[in-house]
Regions:
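Solvent-exposed, conformationally flexible loop/turn segments
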Residues: 79-84, 162-166, 181
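An acidic-aromatic substrate-binding cleft motif
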Residues: 197-216
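Sec-dependent signal peptide recognition
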Residues: 2-9
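Surface-exposed binding patches on compact interaction domains or structured appendages
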Residues: 22-71, 94-171
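Short edge beta-strand/loop segments characteristic of extracellular beta-sandwich folds
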Residues: 86-92, 172-174
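Short, surface-exposed loop/turn segments at beta-strand-coil junctions that are enriched for proline
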Residues: 94, 174-181
């Protein structure tokens, strides 16, 4: 079922006007079938408004738990010219965050530059699934517990985060085939209404090798 949300624009005194946040369509995610423990609730009580940490792109993270991964302040990925490389960071909030937006800056090395258009930072959505079992190759048993797992990479440009939730953000960088080799620095700025800004430094090392196109 689709849900339409409209961010309200607060009218502040002594202002000439205000910008209305865009309307967007999205779906309502399922409730987490796994009950939140008292320990988790206590951990959320220590979390402020909006936080961000880099995390492994090879791991899945619960929507209902405070991230326990040893978060990194800087993410560095590498790839050939023409290669698509990815990374993941986690946003989490104890109080909720309205109108979360991620903006990628240009990539700059010592003597070259790549446009921010080569990159995207997209919100990961959660869906219900079966708990993974390496021995299960059949339909789900009625006794098999369901889990809420990160699954869909959405195209939404703006997102509302509920209180006490974690939201993965999937970062993709398409390295141009004509890129100059070197280490490029960028930054993803995450902003939300009343939450300030969260800055996620990102470095991409372009290796002096060319990945052939599918035509080749």
């Amino acid at each position: 079922m689709k849900l339409t949300r409209l961010f309200a624009c607060a009218v502040l005194p002594f202002m000439f006007g205000c910008n209305t946040a865009p309307e967007f369509n999205t779906f309502t995610e399922a409730d987490d079938p796994v009950a939140v423990t008292e320990k988790s609730l206590l951990a959320w009580n220590q979390v402020g408004r909006l936080n961000g940490i880099w995390a492994s792109a090879d791991s899945l993270y619960s929507r209902s738990e405070v991230p326990v991964t040893p978060g990194q302040k800087l993410c560095r990925i590498e790839g050939w010219k023409g290669e698509r490389v990815s990374a993941q960071f986690l946003l989490y909030t104890g109080t909720g965050a309205e109108g979360v937006v991620c903006k990628v800056s240009d990539f700059a090395s010592a003597d070259s530059r790549m446009s921010s258009d080569i990159a995207s930072a997209r919100f990961v959505r959660y869906t219900l699934g079966d708990q993974a079992s390496p021995t299960c190759r059949c339909d789900r048993s009625p006794y098999s517990p369901a889990i809420l797992a990160p699954d869909l990479i959405d195209t939404l440009k703006v997102f509302n985060m509920d209180a006490r939730t974690t939201r993965p953000v999937w970062v993709t960088v398409n390295i141009p085939q004509d890129a100059e080799p070197g280490v490029y620095k960028s930054e993803i700025t995450v902003s939300a209404k009343g939450c300030g800004k969260v800055r996620m430094p990102l470095e991409v090392e372009v290796i002096d090798q060319v990945l052939p196109t599918h035509e080749d």
